[in-house]
Amino acid sequence: VSYCDYDVVVVGAGFSGLAATLFLANANRRVLLVDSQQGTRNHQALKAYNVVGYGNTSPHQIIAETNEQLDEFNKVKRCSLQVNRIMQREVYDDFLITLSDASSLTVKRVIFATGVTDLLPNIEGIQPFWPHNIFHCPYCIAYELRGLPLAIYSPNDEAYMMAKIIHKWTNDLTVFTEGQANFSAEQQHELDQLGIKINTQKICAVSGEPGQFMNFHLEGDKNHDVLLRRGMFIHLEFQLNNRALIDQLDLVITAEGIVSVDSNYQTSQAGVYAVGDMSHLFQKISHALHSANVAAFHIDHGLAMMPYY
């Protein structure tokens, strides 16, 4: 077995990247954590939800505390550069990593934890309202908004499912379908019985103060009336971060747009793992931590069983 500069390189320093690094640090592994300062998907969120012991804590604080823990491990090194190239060396069963300053190093295993970027719909004025009024996870914020007027934006077949889930938190729910609503007669009857309103008008623009009520300006509204909502839930489309590196390694991407992984979060390329939001549609902090721990556990066991390692 050849000598490598590090046992593992972790690309990405959000929740999943930090969790994987912490696990491997406790396993006494040599780890390089590559943090290009990209920020986490939820870096603007005020709270991290459904994380045991961190009920009212900001994502920034959790990440800061974890980084402080990592400072205690002398085999963990940090790097603020970007990874430009990853080349597998099959004869050595390792990888050659080239960084953005043209330096290179060798590692036994690679963990991608670079996440995804959400893509907001093309609605004028929507950007400032993300994520203070625009949400993709009702299980995080909806309880705090219970009883307030809410909206769903879903110009696809998910509108019925989303309405059935979200109506639990409010009796004043409007579903924007951006055109003809594709509900069956049975579904439409059920939504009517629940008091859920369907609006097929196009949203031309939104305005207001982020974190307060949003004004929805609708197409064809001759009276120029606006609909006030405290928040709008959207099943957002997203794109993988660091797609160039993913394609460079020829990793398989699923039809849903995530990296294909096995039960240990190993990708289609042996020795390369993907954790967090880029590897699963259950895109929560809790899953980011789980996937990172599973991958790190599998890597440590695999390296331990290599001959003469």
Which residue stretches match the model-derived regions?
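Beta1-alpha1 glycine-rich phosphate/pyrophosphate-binding loop at the start
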Residues: 6-64, 158-181
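FAD-site-proximal beta/loop scaffold in flavoenzymes
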Residues: 128-144, 236-282, 294-297, 301
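Short hydrophobic beta-strand segments
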Residues: 148-155
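Residue-level detector of alpha-helix initiation sites
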Residues: 14-15, 118, 157-158, 279-280
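FAD-binding core/adjacent interface of flavoenzyme oxidoreductases
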Residues: 1-9, 77-147, 218-223, 233-235, ...
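A Rossmann-like FAD-binding core segment of flavoenzymes
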Residues: 64, 70-99, 104-107, 170-258, ...
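A conserved FAD-binding loop/helix module that cradles the flavin
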Residues: 21-22, 160-162, 275-309
